[in-house]
Amino acid sequence: MSRSGARVERVPLARYTTLGVGGESEMWFVETHEQLAEAMSAPYRILGGGSNLVVSDSGVPERVLRLSGPLAERDLTPDPELSTPDLIVTGWVGGGVPLPGLIRALQKLGWSGLEGTVGIPGQVGGSVWMNAGTRFGEMFDGLHTIEIVTPDGVRQVTPDDLKWGYRQSGIPRGHVVSRVRLKLRPSTPEAVLAKMEHADQARKGQPKNKTPGCAFKNPGGVSAGKLIDEAGLKGTQVGNARIAPEHGNFIVNLGGATAADVHALLALIRERVGVPLELEYELWPEQLGG
């Protein structure tokens, strides 16, 4: 237990990533801004839902911060001062809230704005930090206010304050998205569900194994998956990691894969594809660049 009451444990990070790889590290489970400030007083990294992440087999030397308690709770009550008949602005949604559960809750309320992100794993904070999305929508489609914790304090910003874009929020690395307010449009549960099912149908070709998600960003509007397919790499395997036969831009853990296996596949893809590819994965530590 830390001075401010945060729970501190050494844990295998593989347990907390969707890929299921990663060595042991010191994890801080933070529930308050005070605990977050203490945890950020030494070198640290932020771990949300563990998607889009490949962690070294030896873990990382920094503290690993995970939002929990009140910072993983949601208040979807419309704010009476900010909401209008055509716009719903919610109470605060913690950065540690699981994104899939939030999307389901919004659908049941009949509130539209984030249904295009259906199927994305992870937590709200990390999804906002990287502006996670699909071709049907992204996190910044439904954001009103973002609360960011930095080593210098807490500040609240709007999307207009940030230089956000495709798979990027403009929030500096190491700054923590602690809470957000959502901005949504009133609709019906049936209409929102229909949009979610349409997006889900388009994702049916994606693998169901343990995976971090898409490995590379689409270069210049061209599908990275298509480029990898054309290079003849679908199904290529190193150790227990494989480029998914269903979709070339996904790497899956067949069981017992290591980060080294995944890194080898990423390097092979970059070598064989004829255009520069920028990683969508985050690497801990940053070994491949890009």
Curated annotation (Swiss-Prot):
Residue ranges that the Swiss-Prot or TrEMBL entry lists as coiled coil: none
Alphabetical keyword list: Cell cycle, Cell division, Cell shape, Cell wall biogenesis/degradation, Cytoplasm, FAD, Flavoprotein, NADP, Oxidoreductase, Peptidoglycan synthesis
The UniProt record lists the keyword Cell division: yes
The family database entries (Gene3D superfamilies) matched by this protein are listed as:
3.30.465.10, UDP-N-acetylenolpyruvoylglucosamine reductase, C-terminal domain, Uridine Diphospho-n-acetylenolpyruvylglucosamine Reductase, domain 2
Q: Which PROSITE patterns match?
A: FAD_PCMH (PS51387)
By which gene is this protein encoded? murB
Source organism of this protein record: Deinococcus radiodurans (strain ATCC 13939 / DSM 20539 / JCM 16871 / CCUG 27074 / LMG 4051 / NBRC 15346 / NCIMB 9279 / VKM B-1422 / R1)
Q: What is its EC number?
A: 1.3.1.98
- GO BP annotations listed: cell division; cell wall organization; peptidoglycan biosynthetic process; regulation of cell shape
Q: What is this protein called?
A: UDP-N-acetylenolpyruvoylglucosamine reductase
At the top of the EC hierarchy, this enzyme's class is: oxidoreductase
